[in-house]
Regions:
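N-terminal Rossmann-like NAD(P) cofactor-binding subdomain of oxidoreductases
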Residues: 1-178, 325-328
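C-terminal substrate-binding/catalytic lobe of Rossmann-fold NAD(P)-dependent oxidoreductases
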Residues: 14-67, 161-171, 175-301
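Solvent-exposed amphipathic alpha-helical surface segments
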Residues: 23, 157, 251, 316-323
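Low-complexity, flexible helical/coil segments
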Residues: 115-123, 138-146, 175, 199-206, ...
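Active-site catalytic microenvironments for nucleophilic, acid-base chemistry
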Residues: 153-157, 229, 315
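NAD(P)-dependent Rossmann-like dehydrogenase/reductase catalytic/cofactor-binding core
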Residues: 274-350
């Protein structure tokens, strides 16, 4: 039995804690909280011990706090750093390394520059075994994770037949729970986005990926518009869809009209947190014209990295074989059943 501490209880931390508490191979030490808000009582009501920074403990006197984050880290085998983005490097240097504890970092951190948290950016579809023996690993962001689920199967099947990937990432403005963030009436563009460099970090620096990124006023998922250019005539749509038919965490939807409709369907089917935890290829938007495949897929920004974190834990803590790790994650997340339900709900009209 391994002891895991979730350092942070936001969009990622709250979800991950809820799922891995049912893992018979893991004991959840507790969750870390940095602000004395309603989420503290939420965590306690769900049965989690709450730990806070030693220097802030007086701010939490109205709550039943278990102890300090420093003590929780010291008693753990692995920490999932789900603290506010950009604090991972400081936590690594001040908390995790001094206490010789393994750590997983989230997509708000970096694998570049002086404050890189790791030399490995994890994507279970690409580099699962490379996490064996690693002490510090960064889990890719929702967009970066999603691109791996699409690009890697294409690369495996078509290889050098593919000349380039050209993508437009349409990012959501804020997550569902981030009610403190206003969603303004504007569209923003992102110069020099990190997403392309992150994908190339795990797929290889010569990956011919070229991205443009915009942010739009919605809380309902990301959308990727991906054009794949081939040396010769592009494959037919049916061939592309067949490639993803049995792909883990990728659903093919025919009749969805928007991202909120997918989220609403997930809620109606009682999916935890209204998350699908996957990529959704919008089959009615798939075109093959000349040498180019034009596809569009939505990315469940709050849910897609949660099973990825769990798979990464198994690589770091147990060095499990790939198939065994995925089967264990499936036993908690039921991704195959969610995929089946979504594909039936948004099936092609006959």
């Amino acid at each position: 039995m391994k002891r895991v501490f979730i350092n942070g209880y936001g969009s990622i931390g709250s979800r991950l804690a809820q799922f891995i508490k049912d893992d018979p191979e893991i004991t959840v030490v507790g969750v870390g909280k940095y602000s004395p808000d309603d989420k503290v009582q939420d965590a306690i009501s769900r049965g989690f011990d709450v730990y806070v920074p030693e220097k802030k403990i007086d701010s939490f006197k109205n709550y039943k706090i278990k102890g300090t984050i420093e003590s929780a880290v010291a008693s753990s085998d692995l920490v999932v750093d789900a603290a506010p983005g950009g604090t991972g490097y400081v936590n690594k240097k001040q908390l995790y390394e001094p206490k010789n504890v393994m750590a997983i970092y989230q997509g708000g951190e970096s694998v570049f520059g002086d404050e890189r948290v790791s030399d490995l950016l994890f994507n279970s579809r690409v580099n699962y075994k490379e996490a064996f023996g690693k002490r510090h690993v960064m889990q890719g962001s929702c967009n970066v994770t999603g691109m791996g689920r699409i690009l890697q199967p294409l690369r495996e099947k078509y290889g050098s037949q593919i000349i380039r990937f050209d993508g437009i990432l349409v990012r959501r403005w804020a997550d569902l729970e981030q009610t403190e963030k206003t969603v303004p009436d504007t569209i923003e563009w992102t110069p020099n986005p990190h997403h392309g460099d992150d994908v190339k970090f795990y797929m290889g620096e010569k990956t011919p990926l070229f991205l443009q990124v915009i942010k739009v006023p919605t809380r309902q998922m990301h959308l990727h518009i991906m054009n794949i250019r081939f040396k010769d005539v592009a494959p037919k749509p049916d061939e592309i869809l067949d490639l993803f038919k049995n792909e883990y965490g990728v659903a093919t939807l025919w009749t969805a009209k928007g991202t909120k409709q997918i989220r609403d369907a997930a809620e109606s089917m009682k999916f935890s947190f209204k998350d699908t935890n996957m990529i959704h290829i919008h089959a009615n938007m798939l075109e093959c014209i000349g040498d180019t495949v034009k596809m569009m897929y939505s990315d469940d920004q709050t849910g897609i990295v949660i099973p990825e974190n769990h798979i990464l834990m198994q690589a770091m803590l147990f060095q499990k074989p790939y198939e065994e790790a995925f089967a264990h994650t499936e036993s908690l997340f039921h991704m195959a059943e969610k995929k089946r339900l979504l594909e039936e709900y948004f099936a092609k009209k006959v």
